[in-house]
Amino acid sequence: VKRTTVSKFGLLALFSASVVFAQADGGPDGVAMKESDPGIPVTDPLVQEKCGACHALDAKGNMSRISWVRTTPEGWAQVIKRMVRLNGLPITPEESRAVVKSLSASHGLAPQEALPVMYLAEKRTIDETNIPNETMRGACAVCHSFAQPLSWRRSKTEWKSLQDLHVAMYSQADAQYRRPAEDSEQPEGRDPKDKMLRGEYALGYMAKAAPLHTPEWAAWRSRQSVPRLAGEWLVVASAPGQGRFVGAFSVKPGKSADEFVTSSTLKSLTDGSTVSRSGAGIVYAGYSWRGSSKGAAAAGKPDDLASAARETMWFAPDQQSAQGRWYWGDYQEFGLDVKLIRATAAPAVLAVVPGPVKVGTKGAQFRIIGHNMSVSLSASDIDLGAGVTATKIVSARPEELVVTADVAANAPSGQRDVAIGGAVLEKAYPVYSKIDYIKVTPETAVSRLGGIKFPKGYAQFEAIGFENGMDGKQGTADDIAVGPVDVTWSTQEFLAVYYDDDAKYVGALSPAALFTPNVEGPNPERRFGRNNYGDVWVVATAKSEKDKFGKPLSARAYMVVTVPAYQKWDQPEVSQ
């Protein structure tokens, strides 16, 4: 028997051909898998041209597979990349961008569907709280975030096709799907010994949680229109470790109706420094902003606010406000959390400085930052919330009021709204009586070794003070976040392996809580010549706040310092 060597290219060609023939013959992707849901027609000639070779167009304008899925711009960009790699799709970058635009509008998500999973497009590293049980975690959130499938809407047939694709391409997925669904409800009348598998449960769950047709999408299809975002916007922003910012965001029309040119200026509420940025953005589906911008000066350090950044924002359907993240770094670990409000002739309150104020304080000074605020006010016209009385206006400008106020000794702890001349800022600042405990955020973090062949992945921490709520218990929902606390930072060994000395090798933590990881690769100074990876505690010790025993308050977060990301799943082209 003669052996034949098959190259990687040959395998790819064979696999691609099988997909095409299967669709043509009515195989797994063709007519044999009957759709019970009505499809969403594809009317764009470019999409029909680029996708029609494999995805048949029926008499109703539906294209196989495509007409039974909806997703975000990143999702469609991901699909096109996969079609190029696996099936050899011939498409130029310009055509690809046009197809992503088109499908994001005709087969995208409604604003209400996209908002809960915007953190995926915003590249946030968070602990997800939307995973219903361990079965779904094992089936869908072991290899990627749960927001990945929740960023899609599919027919039940398409969810099954996606599951089959995972089994074919990723052996680990097959193993996960075959495990019993231990903590999930089982079908009535089923033998208890014959437990539903994770794959079965996940298929049923996703078909119900993220179906193709939803009331939100039906309503948005008729409302979707050309975004009219040109004009001036007010910005409120914050960056972990760098404080709060206010400023302006100017939007001008670009080359097409959904493209814009931008400029912005942000002013620090901590030290008054300013950062100017310029860039451009694209709006998908009438509300979903993807852009890029950079500062006027070159970035001098990894967390520099002038760094070139990508922008992801969600604009409200009324196009009067937006929220999102402008992020940068090789692992998108740095970023500004931003909120935009359209600037109009009406007054607006944006921020209150310095922020937290203690119960019983007399003559506390507040800087109220805003827009078009009246300068003909008396102290009685300024409402600072329950138990806080404005006593004097020190200075008044349309963009800033400086007032003094007294806080009653019996004022209840909690957030206060500020109201001036019809403008209201909710939860503008907290009133507190004491700081009962502190918390390090994020509570879990990932940093990546680098600096030789691969970039470093940094981590930024903050220490936030809290007062116990009405129940007097720590860590419950009614606790009051007071704000950042002045602390001393350090790292401590996370005791997992004897003599590994992770805290010595993983990297360094600055006084401002910016963690810089060590270099990648074997370290001859370390036992067994291991890499500098490891896990440690990041510890914050308060400089002033103490517990009931007179000891400084302290808290810690868990951090894993791991190897570089040798493969990345990203779609930066949607911001270009």
PLM region descriptions:
Residues Q23-V47, N87-G88, E95, A110-E134, ...:
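Electrostatic cytochrome c docking/interface patches
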Residues G88-V117, Q172, Y177-W220, Q224:
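C-terminal capping alpha-helices of c-type cytochrome domains
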Residues P215, R223, A308-A351, A555-A565:
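Edge beta-strand at a domain terminus
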Residues A219-R223, P227-P317, Q323-W326:
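Central antiparallel beta-sheet cores of small beta-barrel/beta-sandwich binding domains
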